Amino acid sequence: MAGIASTLAKKRALAAGFGTNANAVKYMNQDFEALRSQCLSQGGLFSDPTFPAAPQSLGFNELGPSSYKTRGVQWKRPGELCSNPEFIVGGATRTDICQGALGDCWLLAAIASLTLNEDVLARVVPSGQGFGDNYAGIFHFQFWQFGEWVDVVIDDRLPTKDGELLFVHSAEGSEFWSALLEKAYAKVNGCYEALSGGSTTEGFEDFTGGIAESYELRRAPSNMFQIIRKALDSGALLGCSIDITSAADSEAVTRQKLVKGHAYSLTGAVEVNYRGRKEKLVRVRNPWGQVEWTGAWSDNSTEWNYVDAADRQNVKADDGEFWMSFQEFLRHYSRLEICTLTPDTLTDDSFKHWSICKYDSSWRKGSTAGGCRNHPHTFWMNPQFVIKLDEEDDDPDDNEVGCSFVVGLIQKNRRRLRKVGEDMHTIGFAIYEVPSQFHGQREVHLDKNYFLTHAQKARSETFINLREDGDFCLRVFSEKQHETQPCDDPIDATLNDETVSDDEVDAGFRGLFTKLAGPDMEISAAELKTIMNKIVAKRTDIKTDGFSLETCRVMVNLMDDSGNGKLGLGEFATLWKKVQRYLGIYKKNDLDGSGTMSTPEMRMALKEAGFTLTNNIHQILVARYAEGDMTIDFDNFVACLMRLEMMFRVFKKIDTDDSGSIELDFHQWLTFAMI
């Protein structure tokens, strides 16, 4: 219940504007300005109790307390490492970022790309902090985390060994913004070791709030050059790299002066007239300096002598940048990563802005964790979303009528769980064309038969998923306006009037009731429990742990028209009729004859009983009524249906104008919640 309330509160806060870069959420409820002011007034340096200078902040395995790698580690402030520490000297540059004893080169490549865009860097590294007059041993950074920006406060105690920084450091040794940024990112993810291993796209997204794509250039699509130009026109960040095949390959320099395993930035793409034909060129920047491409189209190559003067004016390169032909680029580089930025990140009006939609959801065993296509009987249970694209792209180089969009799917908080033995799941998505009969409809969750008979139109990379629990964030970026929303069943119920009056009860049932009810001719919840459990105990075709007193109270509350907390003859007959109907549905949907229902079978049984429910409601029902092995026995099935029917009937009774909403004061809400 607390988790559901927290989710609702978070959604409302985001809708109110919290979680933007300008109004970031205070991570761990720590307020940078307040904490700094407190330290300055007290004359002390900040020590962060939420990410202490202690072994648990380093790691859990290779950087764990008993690892040789962490022996002799001391946490020191920059002032203890050099006489004149600086936060940023002369602007953030590539030489500020040197890798230490941590496998987070993916993160460093993303940080290096930040240095190429001052506006983006300023969103991650807020101004107004350093080692000057207001120094108090406290710094803060901002990261995008699954749909919201968080402001992360740290102290400046950094792990060192033999007097040197253990992890990221600057080449000069007196500049500390990159080391402090890495520490803040480690805090968000639980510890330093949690940062080991990853992709630059993850860093791109966390530093920009954008959506990242990755292309293997040996399998580049035929329109790769157009994709690059379109990305540059939209102000995207583009990074490229050459894969390494062994540890010895790392930082190896090719014959034409390209460095393997390092991240480059792609900053331009043009076509020039060259010897009577069009030549495609790309401009690449080496954030690591030192070496630069010496092949065709490099700075002093002869190819430039055959380019029109007008074209040459439009083809410029700054220091550290070089041009190469697009074909050479595809041949030498292994991977291209594109991060499309959100409109609020782009300050230059010349860039084309994309339209964005974001949804947070989850996979839960038994309800919405349907797994991959290898699980055809549950695949349909996965969360579904419908995307409607109405406007054609503005693309003069493309004669096809089409609408471009990018889908990004990220799983939440998995790095933080590494400390407890968890890791990333393999996840993915598939895109299907909406059947014509469902055009214009949104409240439709496509069923198993659809996915058994229709092929996907596009998908993410192949993945194997065993239907694990997890939380995710789905985003859709499109060039033109689009509509994206969950594709879910509406909440509705067909509640049949099964009321049996006293006069309609036959003599046989009347005699049975007289025997069961006793002198007062009424059945209490406790008596109902005894009756129901005697009946189900005789059946071998259904499994049950027996009806609980709580379930029997729900039954009585639903059937008790008089309000005395007991069932009379007609009320008991109505209940019995209802239970018999539920038993028929239960048996019908127990497809394997096991005596229990699986959670997918329960979903179909609920529909047959007259209830259509959203994924979120199914998650709650499975969490409440399923056994540990994700099966539903008969008593839990009846309990679920009884509570659902009672809640629907109460709501409909209060919603007199059938508006779909009701208003309750706190006392009324408590009254109904405690039924």
List where the protein language model places each region.
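Structured alpha-helical subdomains that flank or immediately precede key functional sites
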Residues: 1-544, 549-554, 561, 569-573, ...
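Acidic carboxylate motifs that coordinate Ca2+ or other divalent cations, activating on Asp/Glu
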Residues: 520, 562-564, 592-594, 629, ...
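Extended alpha-helical assembly domains of large eukaryotic scaffold proteins
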Residues: 550, 600-603, 616
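Short, flexible domain-boundary/linker segments around small modular repeats
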Residues: 552-559, 563, 618, 628
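Hydrophobic, ordered structural segments
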Residues: 558-562, 567-595, 599-611
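Amphipathic alpha-helical scaffolding segments comprising HEAT/armadillo-like alpha-solenoid repeats
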Residues: 615-619, 648-650
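Strongly charged, low-complexity linkers/loops
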Residues: 617-628, 640
